[in-house]
Amino acid sequence: MRDHNPAKNYPLNQWCMGTMHEARGWTNTILIQDSLLYKYVNSLPVYKCPADRATTRSPWGGGGIPKVRSLAMSCFMNPLPGESRGRGKTYRKQSDFVLGPAMTWVTIDENPSSINDGWFVHESQTGFVDYPASYHNNAGGLSFADGHSEIKKWKSPAVQTFGKRVMTNPTLDRLDATWLYDRTTDFTQPWR
């Protein structure tokens, strides 16, 4: 029997358990329904961009099945203990948003070739650890701490076509990485 108290099921502060790299996470809506956000936003379609047409090959053979989630949360939002990524301000409550809620993104549509857990790691002005999605004519969605959302047009070929072999453009990669970096956290170490 499952414990229906999400706080007990998430000892590591992960907003949504499971992984999108294996079959049991692809279609398991219980992972979303038991997530820490579901009691506030209890509609499954909200957790997947409608433009995400990616499927993952079924372990039973044949075609693919759609994944249930394309959404990931900034790794600086209530991070795992000891997993603050080593630099930057972590956010545990609204008053922690030193950049201001309108300049701090919370969730992002993550590229289907990059999405694994519930976190989106971004801590560099020069490149990406996890890659944003580009479902909307090379653009992807983000939500911010003040409640607004944005569709960001990505310039980098690496972001636009992640998961395919493409040549990167360091200048364009840096433009996209810096744009997201400036809206991620206050990096307290002199990295800029």
Which ranges hold each PLM region?
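Short, well-structured segments within or immediately adjacent to enzyme catalytic domains
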Residues: 1-192
